[in-house]
Swiss-Prot record:
It holds the Pfam family OSCP. This is ATP synthase subunit delta. It comes from Fervidobacterium nodosum (strain ATCC 35602 / DSM 5306 / Rt17-B1). The gene is atpH. GO terms for cellular component: plasma membrane; proton-transporting ATP synthase complex. It is found in: Cell inner membrane.
Length: 181
């Protein structure tokens, strides 16, 4: 996944504070809740006709109703996102925060899209490949997409490896069109 510079700065700032305060998992959960609130109420939260302090209070009221406890630092973080019109980046902030946690532990997130569920043996082969390439232990996020026909698409460290039948067919079609054009 690509992250905006804005999202990565906010995520990294919160991560550094969370690590210092020993609240990384707490802030991770709070970010996910904030993301859910944003996804459900984005029209209201992005409405610039509503004062920022009212939008902040709206989020805090929802968290209070859900009996979600947060500290002053996270309250200020919410305020900062809304006042600076950055709440729209919350999903990227969450992803980068999660990525930073894994990276700090010496792990690497790997997105795998497969035509069918991976067997343990296939997962082990992919694990060894990624580990050899990055010198870090992979953490897989596997998605099944039967439109791939067969094979896998592996995404990690900004690279994409497509070894699917669908991908090969698209390459063949592209090559034929390029020759004819």
């Amino acid at each position: 996944m690509m992250y905006s510079a804005i999202a990565s700065k906010y995520a990294l700032a919160l991560y550094n504070i969370s690590k210092t305060n020993g609240k990384t998992e707490t802030y991770k959960e709070l970010l996910n809740i904030l993301g859910d609130i944003y996804n459900l109420a984005s029209v209201y939260l992005n409405n610039q006709a509503i004062k920022p302090e009212n939008r902040v209070q709206f989020v805090l009221n929802i968290m209070k109703e859900l009996k979600i406890e947060y500290d002053e630092i996270f309250r200020k973080f919410i305020n900062l996102l809304i006042v600076n019109k950055r709440l729209k980046y919350i999903n990227q902030i969450i992803s980068f925060f999660d990525y930073t946690i894994l990276e700090d532990k010496g792990l690497i997130p790997v997105n795998v899209t497969s035509a069918m569920e991976l067997s343990k043996e296939e997962e082990e082969i992919l694990s060894k490949f990624v580990e050899k390439y990055t010198n870090r232990k992979p953490v897989f996020n596997v998605t099944v997409d039967d439109s791939l026909i067969a094979g896998v698409v592996v995404e990690f460290a900004g690279k994409t490896l497509d070894v699917t039948v669908k991908g090969r067919l698209q390459n063949i079609a592209r090559n034929i069109l390029n020759r004819e054009g």
